[in-house]
């Protein structure tokens, strides 16, 4: 804890933006939801892991379904599963290709990697460029599905809900035990010499 300093946390510029801005010296400390690559560390960046947070498969509150499995999620983004259990048409939302959300899904959901590449190349679904935009779009779009972190869900209680994944609820116990496998690792990113204010 430091006294005498004012901490300002601006709106999210995303992991890619935070890494770029930190590397270029525009900000002293960035927040990222993935670890640095070897190329990024070679450019003089360092990281400190500070938290893990659940990644929710989230839907607009109009969706009656409560659970998805890996196969159903892949089918939705492949355009093969087109309706919810009440017959309403699925509206799938994507994050832009370089977003850390996609890295997590490709590692943890078998088959999602090839479907994502095809989906983005064909521009099949609406693509969002920030977590805030994803959350707002989910909240106002009936029958929509997308991806948001656990902290964001609290902002739209009653408008957006998390689905169970493979029958497992996203909560602290299941994240800690590894039963719920979709989670973001959060890092502070900084240049080799950290300012006193940033420390």
Regions found by a protein language model. Name each.
Residues 1-199:
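Exported/periplasmic ABC-transporter solute-binding proteins
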């Amino acid at each position: 804890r430091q006294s005498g300093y004012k901490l300002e946390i601006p709106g999210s510029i995303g992991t890619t933006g935070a890494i770029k801005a930190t590397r270029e010296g525009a900000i002293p400390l960035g927040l990222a939801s993935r670890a640095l690559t070897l190329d990024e560390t070679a450019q003089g960046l360092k990281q400190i892991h500070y938290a893990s947070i659940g990644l929710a498969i989230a839907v607009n509150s109009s969706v009656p379904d409560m659970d998805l499995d890996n196969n159903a999620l892949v089918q939705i983004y492949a355009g093969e599963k087109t309706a919810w259990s009440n017959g309403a048409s699925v509206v799938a939302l994507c994050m832009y290709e370089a977003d850390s959300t996609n890295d997590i899904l490709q590692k943890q959901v078998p088959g999602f990697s090839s479907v994502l590449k095809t989906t983005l190349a064909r521009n099949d679904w609406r693509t969002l460029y920030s977590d805030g935009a994803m959350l707002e779009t989910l909240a106002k779009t009936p029958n929509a599905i997308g991806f948001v972190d656990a902290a964001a869900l609290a902002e739209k209680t009653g408008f957006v809900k998390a689905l169970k994944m493979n029958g497992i609820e996203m909560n602290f116990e299941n994240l800690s035990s590894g039963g719920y496998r979709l989670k973001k690792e959060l890092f502070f990113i900084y240049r080799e010499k950290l300012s006193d204010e940033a420390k």
